[in-house]
Amino acid sequence: MFDVSEAAYDKFMGRYSVRLAPVFADFAGIDAGQRVLDVGAGTGALAAELARRDAVVAAAEPAPTFVAALRARLLSVDVRQAAAEDLPWPDASFDAAVAQLVVTFMSDAPAGVAEMRRVVRPGGVVAVCMWDGDSMEMLGAVNRTQRTLDPSQPTPEQRTLYRSRETLEGLIGEGAQTELLEVESEYVRFEELWSTVIDGAGPAGVWAKSLDDEQRAAAREEMYRQVGSPSGAFTLVGRAWAVRTTRA
């Protein structure tokens, strides 16, 4: 699902995650000198923001292509190829563990969050965030396009878990604090957006790559309609639920 180049991921989702990273880091209360683990670091949007804050940063990422990109880009970060469910650090190694736009894609999210708790010291922070269903306008447009062309396609809630406040709070558990974060991304024209979907990562990219030429043309026209048939530059909004707790 994420077997794509760093450039393809960044064009599709990185443009949002780079903007989300400082807002999420503020929510998690990350300051200089803290030992912070970025779980599911991807191409490094959040890890780079944490490093800019002079935190002592480590990163776990399962995809080999992203691990290589992280190591090349963020020389000060301790990058390890690892899944969230099996983090290769001792107990209480960090002041905070954070996961941006990741928990939906963990093979076992409760186990992943339990591992985040394990590696955080007592009194430290565990924080996650995920897009809020269709209110992430770009993904919402993709999802509505899919369902318009094929009504048997699942809704965002059916397709992926942990895209609502309630499910994320349930995942984090007792003491959860929640905030809805908002970012924007600008596109110079519709073709810029459409090219990111065709080459993109995650479920949207898998779907786009499965289309034949006729289906792809129909999908393009429907998605153009879903984003308001823009004639020039336009902006899409992404909203994400962020949830944090303090380890007892």
Explain the meaning of each model-derived region.
Residues 95-109, 132:
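A short SAM/SAH-binding and catalytic strip from SAM-dependent methyltransferases
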Residues 110-111, 117, 121-188, 204, ...:
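Conserved catalytic/acceptor-binding region of the Class I
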Residues 35-87:
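Class I SAM-dependent methyltransferase SAM/SAH-binding core
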Residues 2-3, 16, 43-45, 160-248:
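Conserved Class I S-adenosyl-L-methionine
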